[in-house]
Amino acid sequence: MALIFAVFFKKIVIDRQIEKLNDLEDEVEKAKLKAKEIVEEAERDAVSKAKEIELKAKEKAYQIKEEIEKEARNSKNEIAQKEARIIKKEEILDGKIEKIEIKSLELEKINDELEEKRKEIDDLRVKQEEELSRVSELTKADAREILLRKVREEMTHDMAITIREFENKLDEEKEKISQKILSTAIGKAAADYVADATVSVINLPNDEMKGRIIGREGRNIRTIEALTGVDVIIDDTPEAVVLSCFDGVKREVARLTIEKLITDGRIHPGKIEEIVNKCKKDIEKEIVAAGEEALIELSIPTMHPEIIKTLGRLKYRTSYGQNVLTHSIEVAKIASTMAAEIGANVELAKRGGLLHDIGKVLVNEIETSHAIVGGEFIKKFGEKQDVINAVMAHHNEVEFETVEAILVQAADAVSASRPGARRETLTAYIKRLENLEEIANSFEGVESSYAIQAGRELRIVINPDKVSDDEATLMSREVAKKIEDTMQYPGQIKVTILRETRAVEYAK
């Protein structure tokens, strides 16, 4: 029994050991599987990371490639631009070289021609010396003197022709330059302008106001006329009073006086005198303000107060219907612009242009030229000699001392002669046209004449059988001279001679 039990127990122990062995084998198998899985997973990770690294490397390589290609393109463009500039410069240089070569060839040709001419002259001189010595039996010295005299005469003739050609070219260039300067000056000095009249019209609230202005037995109107120096015209024109006076200051004082009397309602000699005195003071202030505004407009820094005051009075003065202050400002602008174009003193030209007609305010007090009076007036108040000369010389009454004085005269002519700047009365205008045509018709060979362009051009039709082309040129000068001697007119008048020759034949 005990043996059986021992055998049984041993078997049990052996079975358990076999089971443990089997369990160990299972665990080993599992460990092998686990190890295999770990190895496979590690291999997968390695492959994945390798692919990732490869992808990043490819991306980096692509970026580097793009940057290199971009830099290459930029470099290529820069090189292309530089090549284009170089090609353009080469073309310009080629063109200049070609011009230089052409000029060189021309110079060589001219030198060759001159050399040929010298040879011809030398040959001719030798022949003439021989001929003169042979024919007249003159000495060599006498023959040489005759030959030199003849050559000198021929050269003088050639020089005269050359000088005339250069003079014509110079005249053309001067014309172009002067047109450019004048067009620039007029363009910069363009200004609005309204022609002034010698009468003022005051509108009345009703016709009853006419009686109040006239006053009992005309005392009010006589007081106004006596205090202001203005003719007060009251006629059948409804609700209107006309003031007539060539002195713009007096006319403006009278206008303001009557307007204030109408507004106030009290119209009697005492009130009229009070308002006239007040209006005169107001006008004096406006005169000074007008002078100061002119200086500001032209950027002129300062002047003597008396000059400014006298300058302001030009606002109320006209010449051929043109406001003198407006004209003076325009002349200053044109003169300064022309001075800037030719490199002269701009400030001097501007100052002289503004003051050139200041003497027109003073000519009623002193019987002499307004240019001389104006020059002496500004000299009294410290203006420089160059400005004084510009004022006094603008009508050729004294000699020009500076180029700016000449510019002031030219600017004055431009401002006065431009279309629309000045006007005349209808009667004087018609009479001037008639006189122009009468002067033209007084010459022999004139068939008809027409004053056109508001009297600024005179066209004359002549008989071609009686007047030749050369005589027509001479006639135009004679007509212009006669107009200058016998007529007074603003600006200039163009004289045009028309000569037409017709040949007519009939086919039968």
Swiss-Prot record:
Domain KH: 198-264
GO biological process, one term: mRNA catabolic process
Gene Ontology terms for molecular function: RNA binding; RNA endonuclease activity
Cellular component GO terms, alphabetical: plasma membrane
Family stated for the protein in its record: Belongs to the RNase Y family.
Record-listed E.C. numbers: 3.1.-.-
Function: Endoribonuclease that initiates mRNA decay.
Gene coding for it: rny
Protein name (Swiss-Prot/TrEMBL): Ribonuclease Y
HD domain ranges (all copies): 324-417
Listed PANTHER family: RIBONUCLEASE Y (PTHR12826:SF15)
Keywords assigned: Endonuclease, Hydrolase, Nuclease, RNA-binding
Plastid keyword on record: no
Pfam families found in the cross-reference section: HD, KH_1, RNase_Y_N
Signal sequence annotation: none
Major enzyme class: hydrolase
Keyword RNA-binding: yes
Disulfide cross-links: none
